[in-house]
Amino acid sequence: MKLKKIEYFSRYQEIVERYGQKGCASNDYIQREAADIIIQDNLYEFCGAKNAFLLVKKDGFWRVYYYLNDFDEVLSLDGEVLETEILFRGGLGEPAEVVAYLEKCGFKRHLVRDQYAGMYKDLKSDVENEEIIVQPAQTLTGVQAAFELFNQSFDKYSGDYVSPEVYEGLLVNHSVLLAWRKNEGEAQFLGALHQTIENNVAWVSHVAVKEEARGHHIGQALLDAFVERNMVSEKSRYMLWVQHQNEAAVRMYEKKGFKYVGKSSLSMIKL
């Protein structure tokens, strides 16, 4: 079998109808985006008799969305770098059958992320550090510097790549916050936060601090500014994903008052 490009949305629908049987295991959460991905020539299929992989072309690898009905039918795709995300409820634990199946297909465990949430009235206010200035990016150069930092700081396979084509929109919408301080009259860039708003919930999409500035509460300053800028009422809501392994980040969010909502994601990769 070889990868086959999906040319029409109707073909995507056929795959969903055929393989999306009752009781199947699936992580296909691109249904709202599928038409756009097809128009961009970035959606491919790799289908067996009972199982199917949908693959989205990324920068140097493929992100895999699966429909699994038979854990004995192995889909083996050699010579390609693959990444997939398994969503699960923390209290129930990882779906062992899905993990074991993907391991048979050549995938290995990679990272675990946990989802946290908070409401404004439950979040703690911290004392402002007057040396650290947090403001929305004012230029495209500032937005570019932020995403260069994000790309250097985060896992290339399971992170969300943002195309430079949307930088201008992020600038106009004040979606990128920059942290800096004056150093001998010059602005010293320390870190950045990228936010998105979905269904009246403010999300931390990316946050990173330059290596030489870590340990000086720059991340906390960015988080505080993000919360205050998006406060509409005491019931304003905020959400984020954080790497389970990043103990410093977990402590920062929990100190602020964010709580784990019982939802996690395991990424697996095949190199």
Model-found features: residue ranges?
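Conserved donor-binding loop and adjoining core beta-sheet/short helix segment
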Residues: N27-E80, G191-S205
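Acyl-donor-binding surface of acyltransferase catalytic domains
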Residues: L68-I132, S267-I269
